Amino acid sequence: IWYQFVFEDGTKFNYSGNEEEMEKQISAISPDDVKGYIKLVNFTKKIFEKGYLELSDVPFTKPFFMMKQIPSLLKLKSYKSVYSLVSSYVKHEKLRRILSMHPLLVGGNPFTTTSIYGLILYLEKKWGIHYSMGGTGNIIKGLETLMNEENIKIKKGFEVNKIISNGKTIKGIRLENGDEISANNVVCNADPPDVYERLLNKKDLNFFFNFKRKRMDYSMGLFVYYFGTKKVYKDVAHHTIKFGNKYKEHLDDIFDKKKLNDDISYYLHRPTATDNSMAPDGCDCFYVLVPVPNNQSNINWSESGEKIKNLVIDKMEKDLLPNLRENIIEDFYLTPDYFEKDLNTKFGSGFSIQPKFTQSAYFRFHNKSEIYDGLYFVGAGTHPGAGVPGVLSSAKVLDKIL
């Protein structure tokens, strides 16, 4: 299975690429929704073909190119949210939650994220769910190996604290130790809103760019709790998503009201289900990710972090991992403060700006800076967006620009 979904009433749904099994489980919940599910998958195939195969690695730097796409995007119901699109095909609330959850994987609210992101549903159907053996860090190691093979010099351990410009022409970067490196082109994988605010001269930013920048909506924050256990929980899937009692209300609290509540939903990652090298023999390892408000909330995470940790341990102990607390041997957690202070994301958001229609493609921060000659962006805040496939695709976009 790809994901196991768990509901408060104990219902479990094993989400996979086996369509026969999928339809059987859907029928057990709501027989009338099987046909709607099939139609939904077929519709998301059309979105995938346009939004991913055709546009995910294409630069959106010119308004005319964006305008050319509008008729096709409207035909694909891009004006609807993912939840609204799913709801037009299936009626049972549990199925609506399961089939509309994908925007959360890229920092979006299913109730406001454009239905174009419904393409993730079909992307998984086409190519499956993949895991980097040894952890996601091995993707970075692989890229480093490739760079070394191409004789690209890598300088580690120095934070960039200034991008140097002469007027609106990029001249290089300054490191935290004071060293300067001259360059005509700077490719930046940091969060664009933070870069424009902190590393560049704000006087260079024009009225229209500032107007757009200051009105952007940011993705949720993340509470991420890593823990190892002296017990193996062999029946727990690699990916588990547990829904709280309320769905929309919980998302409203996170994205709009910017407040915490106890009725949490969470995602539990157990890599040892696939890769037993991730924990010693007889042990298990996990992280649990809880969507929380970003730092626009002004939440004191030094106080709230410990409360959420204990809350989520209690929930997991009840839902999936019996006697968890007594079996934890190593643990630590990260809050939006880590994302803001260590990773320099604006407001500690986990995925940069939200993937709403008005913040997608041309309306995101451009891969080729709108302000500076010689400044380019890759990563979650630029086109096409967050998530490993999106971030890696942003490099493909840049390859077509440079």
Task: Give the predicted meaning of each segment.
Residues 380-402:
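A conserved FAD-binding loop/helix module that cradles the flavin
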Residues 161-280:
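Mid-domain catalytic core of redox enzymes
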Residues 92-106, 263-269, 322-384:
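A glycine-rich dinucleotide-binding beta-alpha-beta segment and adjacent secondary-structure elements
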Residues 98-126, 130, 369-373:
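Active-site-adjacent "gating/activation" loops or surface patches in catalytic cores
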Residues 119-177, 184:
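Helical element adjacent to the flavin cofactor pocket in flavoenzyme catalytic cores
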Residues 8-112:
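Rossmann-like flavin
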Residues 230-340:
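C-terminal segments that line or cap access tunnels to active or ligand-binding sites in enzymes
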Residues 1-2:
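N-terminal FAD cofactor-binding segment of flavoenzymes
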